[in-house]
Amino acid sequence: MFLALLYLALPLADVLLSAEVSGLPGGDRLDCVKASDQCLKEQSCSTKYRTLRQCVAGKESNFSRATGLEAKDECKSAMEALKQKSLYNCRCKRGMKKEKNCLRIYWSMYQSLQGNDLLEDSPYEPVNSRLSDIFRLAPIVSVEPVLSKGNNCLDAAKACNLNDTCKRFRSAYITPCTSSTSNEICNKRKCHKALRLFFDKVPPKHSYGMLFCSCRDVACTERRRQTIVPVCSYEDREKPNCLNLQESCKKNYICRSRLADFFTNCQPESRSVSSCLKENYADCLLAYSGLIGTVMTPNYIDSSSLSVAPWCDCSNSGNDIDECRKFLNFFQDNTCLKNAIQAFGNGTDVNVWQPILPVQTTTATTTTASRLKNTGSETTNNEIPTHNDSPACANLQAQKKRKSNESVDTELCLNENAIGKDNTPGVSTSHISSENSFALPTSFYPSTPLILMTIALSLFLFLSSSVVL
């Protein structure tokens, strides 16, 4: 009898599991604009929300002088009450119609719940795309360009001109980024805005094709470096201190959010197969491109490597020199980002067939500095392996080949560290395709509450049948 009841309970458990999977990570989660509107229509939520906004804005300061702990308790009470509302878990979408307003609402909540100095949690709804999805739509960045002897970045620019959307938005940023004004080289504000629109609106198969194209020679890499018109969008008369630039970025909702997204999705992890904590190259490249058009705009440092950095340095850092270097090194020596750029240029992706060992991570309440220290001693050698070693794409594919006993293709991974040494690409051992892979997402595995619910249901049915008998 018990086995029969268990047999009946299992389909129900499967339904519950499916519901949980479909609800993660976003499910019915609202964007912050809709969540705010919904909250303001409910009297109890509206009252708590208005109180919280006053707390965030600092308008409670005069009130707190009069009532002391009572004011703090009221802020805390409002915060706890809103944790039960959809506003608590709201997110925004990059390039959405009311993005800035959405981000303002998100940060008003986040600053109250977590503090004002954190950048780790991205306010954007996860996209969870794969490079392989882009490759299926983009012949120009597939295997053929890697083997060609032409200029891939030039080919990508030509492909952009053949696409109406890409051509329109590219022209829209070229004009303000190259038009000088009376006192300045260009109007940087208009240039930045147009660049953001380009990377937000143009399909990655075209925008990434110009920004992350693989190169064999300096002419190609220099064209890649010039993609964002750095003389206007990137360079300035003087380099500010990186920590000061970070503070300026945090004062702008768009910049702060894009930087948080970059820290979240390009976090290096030396123990992972891809050198990325999240094992997703596409999300890292999306986060990186999202910074372009903000005061934290990054670009390739020179024409001989994949190292990138914002326009800043660590001079005049004083006692904060270590923190400044960690911040700057997150850009310059980021193995995850470098591997992602190289993978896109090679037409490869993370091998999701390879089982990943669990990685212990820090919580969302760690500070930016403590999060960046993970890029220290464990990742001091962050350069992409030279042609004498197997680069990330070769290592990943070799693992897949060993599982299937297939031979390893030795032609399709291009290593840009060989640029300048000779006129042939560094040879690696393989080309990766994750098109047919089916690694299960983390959200697939049942949660503890769901397991307990299933067990309780089975036990209840068993006891009920016993009473009947």
Swiss-Prot record:
Residues 431-469 form a propeptide. One of its GO terms (cellular component) is external side of plasma membrane. Sequence repeats lie at residues 28-116, 149-237, 238-341. GO terms for molecular function: glial cell-derived neurotrophic factor receptor activity; signaling receptor activity. Disulfide bonds join 39-45, 153-213, 160-166, 177-191, 186-232, 215-220, 242-312, 249-255, 266-284, 276-336, 314-324. GO terms for biological process: glial cell-derived neurotrophic factor receptor signaling pathway; nervous system development. It is found in: Cell membrane; Golgi apparatus, trans-Golgi network; Endosome; Endosome, Multivesicular body. Glycans are attached at residues 62, 163, 346, 405. PANTHER family: GDNF FAMILY RECEPTOR ALPHA-1, GDNF RECEPTOR ALPHA. Belongs to the GDNFR family. This is GDNF family receptor alpha-1. It comes from Gallus gallus.
